[in-house]
A protein has these predicted regions:
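N-terminal extracellular/periplasmic Venus flytrap/periplasmic-binding protein-like
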Residues: 19-20, 31-32, 39, 183-286, ...
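Active-site-proximal alpha-helical scaffold in enzymes
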Residues: 94-125, 174-203, 275-282, 347-348, ...
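Condensing-enzyme catalytic core mediating Claisen C-C bond formation in acyl metabolism
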Residues: 2-34, 44, 175-176, 244-310, ...
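Flexible glycine-/small-residue-enriched beta->alpha junction loops
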Residues: 117-172
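Active-site pocket-lining segment
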Residues: 168-171, 204-207, 214, 296-365
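Conserved active-site "lid/cap" helical segment
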Residues: 2-78, 82, 86-89, 97, ...
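Conserved catalytic cysteine-centered active-site region
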Residues: 63-119, 149, 160-166, 243-268, ...
Length: 415
């Protein structure tokens, strides 16, 4: 039996899943704080769930890199400006790239324990607003010494335990599983093609709430706002998907000499937020609310930091072992494409057919907004199960430092 955390949920459902567009960093959303992006997604999620803010009994929110000076209050502000009562507590959750999945796990746990019947989940990230930071400035700088300001976004990709960065962990997996540059580029090209098709068909638009210039108010508190720049009136479309033939990707230089990972076959840097309401199933049924899917189980595991990207494989294996399902029972997988080689290594380790994986494109094509990714993937998965009429799906991601996390969800209409 695999080791790690496993939880099963008897009657927990997800509603109103939604996200903002995923927009390339330094793009149209780059000046907006993750808090305001989170508020935007939260308000729309509650609306799509057929609820009001007063119906929410818990706020669970995640944000990795501070994008503003009020980040400490991120979950609280998201709740207040989404109309959640002031008496309702809010919690900041952090499991790096697994944060969005962890929000679902914690919500299920709270509901199963009887702490609440309803929870609002919000993940938001501004890669653009990652700070340039120094951690030793309060004690002063010596005359003539180098000032230690560094790019938080770049430095956070380094794992000081094994002494390597995240791209190098993918290179380790490429060597371990015999994955070639050609395979990685082909996988990336496919991801782009699937995302473009999903965009052109209107599928992705169904989970997007356009970002517009607007004001958010909370009674008795200072108003917040989003103001788009220039002549923009709305941002409604993911910006990164584009057809990317293998021949074009093959021309890009590898990040590390002799390696397989490039800027074209790794996850895109984007700014975005995603939100979902999670409730007790009986609560939703009694009120006739539009359920997207049942959250059936969650798993979390640890793996060696130097091959952190393999994390989804043991997390998914644990999920299947403890739930009594087989790999073949799962119709759709959404596994975060942190790096192309990393995702291919997970598929090879599991023996997973690629035609069931990220069928609407993945993070290589769409982007990886850290704390928002798990919510985005799980919402996309629920919508894809509904569209295809399939029953079971798993969403999953690797986690920097060496972890894996996975969620099992069920389309109740196909049960």
């Amino acid at each position: 039996m695999s080791s790690g955390f496993f939880q099963t949920f008897r009657d927990v459902v997800m509603l109103g899943g939604v996200r903002t567009p995923l927009v390339d960093y330094c793009g149209a959303l780059g000046h907006i704080s993750p808090t305001d992006l989170g508020i935007k997604a939260a308000r729309e999620s509650i609306k799509r769930a057929g609820m009001i803010g007063a119906d929410i009994g818990s706020v669970l929110a995640g944000n990795m890199a501070p994008g503003d000076f009020d980040q400490f209050m991120f979950p609280r502000h998201v709740g207040l400006y989404a109309g959640v009562p002031v008496q309702v507590p809010a919690l900041m959750t952090q499991r790096i790239c697994g944060t969005g999945f962890e929000l679902f796990r914690q919500a299920g746990e709270q509901i199963e324990l009887g702490l609440t019947q309803t929870a609002l989940l919000v993940g938001a990230e501004s890669m653009t607003r990652n700070p340039i930071a120094a951690f030793d400035h309060r004690t002063g700088f010596k005359l003539g010494a180098a000032v230690g300001f560094k790019d938080f976004m770049w430095e956070a990709l380094q794992d000081s335990a094994p002494g390597i960065n995240m791209i190098q962990t993918a290179e380790n997996l490429a060597k371990k599983y015999g994955i070639s540059r050609q395979e990685v580029d082909a996988f990336a090209s496919s991801s782009f093609a699937k995302a473009v098709a999903a965009q052109d068909s209107g599928f992705l638009a169904g989970e997007i709430t356009p970002v517009i210039s607007e004001t958010f108010e909370a009674a008795g508190y200072n108003a917040r706002s989003i103001r788009l720049q220039g002549k923009l009136t709305e941002v409604a479309r993911d910006s990164h998907p584009r057809l990317s033939p293998i021949e074009v990707l093959a021309k890009l230089r590898a990040v590390h000499e002799g390696g397989v990972q490039t800027g074209g076959n790794s996850s895109a840097l984007v700014d975005a937020a995603a939100a979902c309401v999670v409730t007790c199933g009986s609560y939703a049924r009694e009120r006739g609310l539009p359920v997207m899917a049942r959250v059936a189980a969650a798993s979390v595991v640890g793996v060696p930091p130097e091959i952190m990207g393999i994390g989804p494989a043991p997390a998914i294996r644990l999920l299947l072992e403890r739930s009594g399902l087989q790999l073949g029972d799962i119709a759709r997988f959404e596994i975060n494409e942190a790096q192309g080689a990393q995702t291919l290594a997970v598929a090879k380790e599991l023996g997973l057919d690629l035609d069931r994986l990220n069928v609407n494109g993945g993070a290589i094509a769409l982007g990886h907004p850290l704390a928002a990714t798990g919510v985005r993937l799980t919402v996309t998965l629920a919508r894809e199960l509904e569209r295809s009429g399939k029953r079971w799906g798993i969403s999953s991601a690797c986690v920097g430092g060496g972890q894996g996390i996975a969620l099992l969800i069920e389309n109740l209409r196909a049960a």
